[in-house]
């Protein structure tokens, strides 16, 4: 049943869409649109294709959401001369497949109204007729602060070629809806107009009698749920008038007047009254107060002024506390002026002809601050080559260092000097500890080497002891064997003696040589056995 009722409803909607009364009302509205002023008519036409959702009458009958068209929210007031289109209070009767919108934007002579930059928001289209009609009626004021644009939207692509030559804005079809759009004065870019996928822009001059419409792009094919409508924005040209120029000058002069006012405020601002307790506290800590800072700056300027007379001797005009040992060594001219109280640029120094160390002459190196001269070999440490430029002897260097140590330090400089001294002492201590640590490390390495040598010597001694013990045991065994042999020989001699005493005749009858040899042998070997 729904499928059979849908064509009938579609036929009814088409019949309502082609209404003669609506055509008549639109033709009556055209002269009022053509009666716009030249300010609203002159301008350039900008055609920007914008994609927007399209809701057909079938979808509207099915109960789906109403169509939403991107439109500029009215941030300014709507003039009384703008008509309210009657087509806004009735829904469209034909499913739109292509939409065209012609927007005639009016620009105020004020330069603070850019019509190209607008804020775009979604305004419900034909669904909210009472609210849309109530807004223009409530916000009625003369056209003085914002531009006004007319949006002529066509929902019938077949009647898009119908145009009225006698009107200021072309009539697109019978079902054209004329909607006044307000261009806001803020400079926010329209996100939906600029983010369209096909930004085709055409510029052409506008005549008050006709407004040509740009044909739609063939590549912009409609979709079943989204249609493509084209917005033509006419930006009027600003006419230079004496009143507008006079009105536009004060905004440019305001920043300069504001800058002058801030300068006057800074100049007229009284000097800050410092707390006496704060000043006393700063003085007690040695900090620099405002008055002391101004005094230091004035003295510095005076020193700069005086030093420009002779830049070579600018170091002589520095204060005592700013002189360091390095400055003394690097600037010997100052040493002469301070040590001898006789500036070297007034009287030339007559140097000695003999060395101050060995009292001999020839090949002397003169000092730049005193009359003394030295041999290069007599210096400590001795120099191999003569130094270039002005040379300072060790005696003058010691004088300068002693004089620099006696300079009193006051205020903040005393704190800085004490900190520098403390840091120097700590650094020296650190260097001494590092040196002592390196010495101890070297000593430790030497002791380890000595320990290794002693360990090897002890090992050798133990090996020698074991070898000597082995030899001693061998010698003792050999001695035991010799003693046994001696006892055996002595026993044989006693046997021979006893035999001779018992039978002397037979023994003397024959020659006997062996006992004599055996008798002599024990006499020789006996002392060895006792040893």
Swiss-Prot record:
It comes from Homo sapiens. SMART domains: PHD (SM00249). Residues 79-99, 184-222, 238-277, 295-314, 507-531 are annotated as: Disordered. It holds the Pfam family PHD. InterPro entries: Znf_FYVE_PHD, Znf_PHD, Znf_PHD-finger, Znf_RING/FYVE/PHD. One of its GO terms (molecular function) is zinc ion binding. Residues 522-531 have a biased composition (Polar residues). Residues 265-277 have a biased composition (Basic and acidic residues). It comes from the Eukaryota. A zinc finger (PHD-type) spans 352-399. The keyword Zinc-finger applies. The lineage of its organism: Eukaryota, Metazoa, Chordata, Craniata, Vertebrata. Transmembrane segments: none annotated. Keywords: Coiled coil, Metal-binding, Zinc, Zinc-finger. This is PHD finger protein 21B. Residues 423-465 form a coiled coil.
